[in-house]
Design a protein with these regions (language model features):
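C-terminal regulatory domains involved in ligand/effector binding and gene-expression control
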Residues: 1-92, 97-306
Length: 306
């Protein structure tokens, strides 16, 4: 048994809170799962046909959140922050029971997910992990917005650029090595919106549970949250959190370089669809140290990937 093997949580972890878009109170319980189970949501408010798999092909909505849906029309929405936390902690297998359609927003970041899952402890199995290795550069463009993915050795590097006319948000950028860097600022960064967009968002039936307790609100040159920002790049850092969570709908940790400008849930999902439409674009590799070329072996990096 080593750090190259699959992990789940040691004990059940529960969260309760308001859902950002529906405004309903929701309870979730993350439970341990066997190797090769993967991440699976279970809608316990339904008796049958209630398993929903967070796979990019099951994503049916990317407007202000990522929503997945099974073949019976049962959905789970706003999965991205929880998925980002599971990715970051190296959780390969978990059953997530949820009693409503939307994951609770908590404070708008992945902070509480990370802290409580860590406190529960991790359970390491003997089953080797698998990663997705990108074989060629793939790009998806939507007007001025774009996202690309290209091969990397043993790293997931994300270079993200954000461009807003609002002077508080402005043009922010950040680069992270997901398996190596301290991502505290990424996981602590909250969702955000412009004050002038709130009315339209609510007219579309969204953000019914939104408040200054779970989102940064920017009005002209002011941040309405009394505590201000948690870090200097909180806006772009939150977008990176979303990107990590959405990438995990591939089913595995990805080894690649990501370059994104003005991206979001839609771009990341479309990129994954484009990658997986051709088997020549990627390889699924079972990571066993004996299978790695000697030149690739970096034990500390392998440990961080796992």
């Amino acid at each position: 048994m080593s750090y190259l093997t699959q992990k789940t949580i040691k004990n059940n972890v529960s969260f309760s809170g308001v859902a950002l878009h529906s405004g309903l109170n929701v309870n979730i319980c993350i439970k341990p799962a066997e190797p090769n189970h993967g991440i699976v949501f279970k809608r316990v408010d339904f008796k049958v046909n209630n398993l929903v798999y967070p796979n990019f092909m099951n994503v049916t909505n990317t407007s202000l959140n990522t929503t997945i849906e099974n073949e019976f029309g049962i959905k789970v929405s706003t999965i991205e922050h929880l998925m980002g936390a599971l990715f970051g902690l190296g959780i390969d297998n978990a059953l997530i029971e949820i009693d409503n359609e939307e994951v609770p927003i908590l404070d708008g970041s992945a902070k509480e997910f990370i802290e409580k899952i860590i406190s529960s402890g991790l359970l390491i199995s003997e089953a080797p992990i698998k990663i997705i290795k990108i074989n060629k550069e793939i790009k998806f463009t939507d007007g001025e917005r774009y996202i690309s993915i290209e091969p990397s050795t043993l790293s997931l590097d994300i270079d993200f650029k954000l461009k807003y006319k609002n002077s508080i948000i402005g043009n922010q950028s950040n680069k992270v090595k997901v398996f190596e860097d301290d991502l505290t600022d990424i996981y602590n960064s909250r969702t955000f919106c412009l004050f002038e967009d709130i009315e339209m968002i609510k007219k579309n039936g969204l953000a019914k549970g939104g408040s200054l307790n779970n989102a940064i609100v920017v009005k002209d040159k002011d941040i309405l949250n009394s505590e201000g920002l948690r870090n200097d790049k909180e806006f772009v850092n939150h977008k990176i959190l979303d990107c990590i969570g959405d990438l995990y709908t591939s089913g595995y940790r990805i080894v690649a370089k990501i370059n994104c400008s003005q991206g979001g849930h839609y771009l990341t999902n479309q990129l994954l669809r484009k990658v997986f439409e051709n088997k020549d674009n990627f390889s699924i590799v079972e990571i066993k140290e004996k299978n790695l070329p000697h030149a690739m072996i970096n034990r500390s990096l392998l440990k961080s990937i796992a």
